[in-house]
Amino acid sequence: MREGEDDTQFTIVTAWFDVREFENHHLKDVDENGHYCIPDHYFRSAALLFNKEMPMVIFTEERYRDRILSLRPPSYIDKTVIVIKDYCDLYGWDLFPRFLENHQNAPIRNLSVEKFTAIYKWIINQKVEFVREAIELNPFSTSKFGWMDMRLHVVYDMSVEETIEIFNGIPEDRVLITQCSYTHPNEIGDRRGFYEWTRGKVAAGVFLGSRDALLKFCDLCREELLVSISEGLCPTDEMIYSVVIARNNGLIEPHIGDYSDVLRNMSHNRGSTHLAINFLNKSFQEGNHYFTWKVAENLRKGVLNESICPSIEQVYNIWYYNYVANFWLGNREYCKTILYELYRIGSQKMELGDHIRGMKGFLLSMIDYLHDSDITSKFRDL
C-alpha cells in the first residue's frame, strides 16, 4: 500500500492460550516435539502475522499481553486490541467438566492424545467465539472479519495486498473456509459414528467473511458443539466445521487445500491440487453448481498462471465443469468466455486438442445449449 493509504476494511482475529502450562502437561518444558512447539517458538513464528499492517483483535491471557504487543510494530499499536481472558471467562466454561468426561469416555480414535488434550480441543473450539466477540466489539468499525491462526504465515507469507484482494472477493452472504474433501450430509449420519474419527475434511487455520455471514456460521458451530457435548462427544473445531459446512452449503465459499496451502491457494491453486481435483469431481457429481464453479475457477487460474500442471484430462474437466456449472447458474456470457478459452488452449496444445477431438460429439451436444453458432463452428472445425 502507498504511504498513508489504508484499504483494510476487515479485522483479523487470533488468539494465544498456553494450555500446556494450564494443564501442567508433562511435555510443557520440552523444547519442541512433533506435537507442538513451546511459546518461544510459537511467538517467533507469529511475528510474520503481527508485522502485517492489518487491524487485529487478539485474545490471550494477561501474562502474554506485553509480549504480544512487543511483536507489533509501534506504528501498528493503534490497530491492535488485546482482549484478556481467564479460562473461566471462555464461552461455555461451565460445560468443560462434561467435555472432559466425554473426552475420556468417547476418545477420537486417530488423534494424538499428547496434542489433542481436552483443554486444547476446548480452546480451538473457541475460535468462533473469539470471532463473534470481535464482531460485537468491532473496535475498528470494519465490515468484514477473519480468523487466522497465529503461525499460518510461516507456511505462506501472504501479503496485506493479497489479503485485501481475498476479502474483497468473498460474497457478502458466504464464509470462506478451507476444505480438504467434500462432505455430503449423508456421510454424517449418526453423529457419534462421524465424530469417532477425525476425517481430515477441513483445514481450519482461516475463515473469513462479512459480519452477518460469520455470525451465522458462529451460531451454527456453537449449536453443533452444544449438541455434541449433550450427546457425550468431544469433537475438534475442524470436525464441527465439516458438519456445519455439509448441512449449510449455501453459507460457504469453497476453498480447497491442505493446511500448508490454506493461504497459498487463496488467489489461485498452487498446491494440494489432488485435493482440489477430487473436490471438483465430487461437487460436479453432486450437482453442486456453485462449489463446482468456484473450485474450477481457482484451478483454472492455477493452470493459466502455470502454478500447477494437471493432466490433459483434468485440464479439460476444469474448463468443461466450469462451463456446465455456469450454464446452470445462468452465467451464459461467462460460459462463452470459458469455451473460447478452452478452444484457444486446445488449438495451441496438441494433446489437449486431441482430447477435445475425442470428446467432440458429446461436447458439441453440450455446447449447442448455448445457441452460439460461432462457438459451435470453432469446436466443430478444431
Residue ranges with predicted function:
Residues 335-350:
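TPR/TPR-like (Sel1-like) alpha-helical repeat modules
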Residues 302-312, 347-354:
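Flexible helix-coil transition and linker loops at the boundaries of alpha-helical arrays
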Residues 1-41:
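N-proximal low-complexity "stem/linker" segments adjacent to membrane-targeting elements
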Residues 77-137:
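Active-site-proximal specificity loops/subdomain of glycosyltransferases
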Residues 154-158, 175, 195-279:
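Catalytic core and acceptor-binding pocket of nucleotide-sugar-dependent glycosyltransferases
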Residues 278-281, 317, 321, 359-363:
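"A position-specific structural signal for the A-helix of alpha-solenoid helical repeats
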Residues 119, 123-177:
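GT-A fold catalytic core of metal-dependent nucleotide-sugar glycosyltransferases
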